[in-house]
Amino acid sequence: MSQKSQIIKTLKVLQKWLKESRLDLFDVSSKIIQHVEESYPDDAPKSKTAKSKSLHFSQTGDFPKPEYCQSEFDFAIYSDGACRGNPGPGAWSSLGQNMEGEVLFQAASFSEQTTNNRMELSGALEGMKQFIEYAAEFHISLKKVKIYVISDSRYVVDGMTSWVKGWKARGWKKADNKVPENCELWKEMDEVRESIGNVEFKWVKGHAEHPQNEYCDRMCNELLDRELSSTNTSTSTRNDSLH
């Protein structure tokens, strides 16, 4: 129950007692209730969406508490990426939670031409960036927190827990002396991780009824459906105008 609802409920109990007691304060209590209803805005959740050209979703539903978070300074970032055609149109998504399971932020973004790996990387990267913004807004010290980035992409998790260290040691080159694919994204991922400090990447099996992972997957695919439907409609309209 919101704070506003609790205040009104308490006042109405008092009002009922005043009415039954036939006290002159009944009318006064009515005016107090009216004032509360008009003056207090409905309570809003302490969630934040990234300030970017992205499609944000407000209906998160109920999620369980993040599986790795053990203290108030532990936070979880779930991310996902999708691509149709690979390469082709794609989308990334991210969702941030605290230890209690409260959704702190969520976002999804569409790309006209990309790959699945780039979208998986982008989901994790943008999720970390959003957490940094959230921490700054609510005065949370990055020195105190531990972040768990949870993804169903082995590419992301193995890259950040194993490959990046070797690439950096070789001047961002692979063992065969070639530049890693999506190198600019890997570099940015590494920089953002270092700016936070304590970040651990965890793998979760995709399409295995994991609520947060399934939600991120749904955000990606719903955004893709919407964007591609809009594109097809626009193309159809242009073709019709030529006849």
Short names for language-model regions:
Residues 37, 103-106, 112, 136-146:
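Phosphate-ester processing/binding pockets and catalytic centers
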Residues 46-60:
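Non-catalytic propeptide/linker segments at domain boundaries
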